[in-house]
Amino acid sequence: MDRSELAKYGTSQHPQYVRYRHERHLPPVKAAAGTARDFVESRLRAWGRTDQIEDATVIIGELFNNALLHTDSKELVAAIDWNGGRIRLEMWDDSPDRPRIAPVDFEKESGRGMYIIAALCEIWGSRLAASGKCVWVILPE
């Protein structure tokens, strides 16, 4: 789908594009990681972006697991956003603590989540919210 198919209103000099955004509220339990991955996969299929499924589902799974492991959130929110260009993934939680990429010990079985995310995405970051934070990821085109 090209950008012209997404035009909703505006002029040729100042077009406004539709922004597709979907959220899924998730309980903070391990089994919900699969729900987050299925949610992202279904949106990418609906948008015809099947080339992004593998990386996106790995990333959202890592974001979910990091939030589950490092926060005491009562609820997590996975979001996927597309405006006809790049795909943006988000994970919202109740903690104000921002993630960081720690030195990786490849002998251990855990501790590589943000390292994996950084390797698969174009850019990632986080922002504080009124009650917690959002960790966001932009996928390469």
Predicted regions mapped to residue ranges:
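Conserved short strand/loop->alpha-helix "switch" segment adjacent to the catalytic nucleotide/phosphoryl-transfer site
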Residues: 34-61
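Short coil/turn residues that cap or connect secondary-structure elements
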Residues: 28, 44, 48-51, 68, ...
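Histidine-centered phosphotransfer motif of kinases
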Residues: 55-73
